[in-house]
Design a protein with these regions (language model features):
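Active-site gating loop/helix substructures
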Residues: 1-54, 76, 228
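An amphipathic, hydrophobic-aromatic interaction surface with interspersed Lys/Arg
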Residues: 75-84
């Protein structure tokens, strides 16, 4: 939300100033692009596409998508041509974003990068684990991910069988142990904090200290859970 507030509609991405870089990018052998703040402006919510294109110079194998978009679309004042245009842009961006998310998370893992999504709209609860197990059953999780959780092909097959309910409960408990859910559960943000985080609008209004802290709490917890679920191979054994 804070990043989106920095780049209003119609503006190009902001290039990170040289003084914030640890080394000169022109000296790097693979000539990477200088980092840019792309969440906002003409590239709002479109960043994940470039990162997952095989021939893109931005391509990467592990992608964590922090989605703090919080725009609401209302029919109020749609007779105003400016508001109507803004609502049209917002609706288009929301559809593109959700299509990308559905393709990256809820379709077959074959020939795809590893994605972990952190949307502001998702609640901090065990539903994240239930969603992961559903993705397992539907064949949307990379084998190196479920193998890292010590889940077997037989257990995934059982999720589709006659005893699927029992298998689901067993797998949920196994995943909980694998990601150390007991530790994460103690750090779940309060409902009041979640409500404050979701009430922050994506505009040029300055955020209060409480709003910033609420956004950080929600994003930090959700990121830790999603990375433990979908990118366990990036973590050390002692989490």
């Amino acid at each position: 939300v804070m990043a989106s507030s920095c780049v209003p509609y119609g503006f190009m991405p902001i290039t990170i100033d040289k003084k914030y870089l640890t080394e000169e990018y022109k000296n790097c052998p693979n000539k990477p692009e200088v980092p840019k703040l792309i969440d906002g402006g003409v590239y709002d919510n479109q960043g994940a596409h470039k990162l997952s294109q095989n021939k893109s110079k931005f391509h990467t194998d592990f992608i964590i998508v922090s989605d703090a978009g919080n725009s609401t679309i209302s029919a109020n004042k749609t007779t105003n041509i400016f508001i109507l245009a803004m609502n049209t842009i917002t609706l288009m961006m929301d559809r593109v974003k959700k299509m990308q998310r559905a393709n990256n998370l809820y379709e077959s893992y074959a020939s795809k990068e590893h994605f972990a999504y952190v949307p502001l709209e998702w609640e901090c609860s065990t539903r994240l684990i239930q969603g992961f197990v559903t993705n397992l059953k539907d064949g949307n999780v990379h084998p190196d991910v479920w193998q890292a959780h010590t889940i077997t092909e037989g257990e995934i097959t059982n999720l589709k069988g006659a005893e699927s309910k029992v298998a689901q409960e067993t797998t949920i408990e196994k995943v909980k142990n694998a990601i150390h859910w007991s530790e994460l559960e103690q750090k779940i943000p309060l409902q009041e904090s979640e409500h404050i985080a979701r009430s922050v609008g994506t505009n040029l209004t300055a955020l209060s200290h409480k709003e910033i802290e609420s956004l950080i709490e929600h994003s930090a917890w959700l990121t830790e859970v999603q990375v433990r679920l979908y990118m366990p191979m990036l973590l050390t054994k002692e989490m």
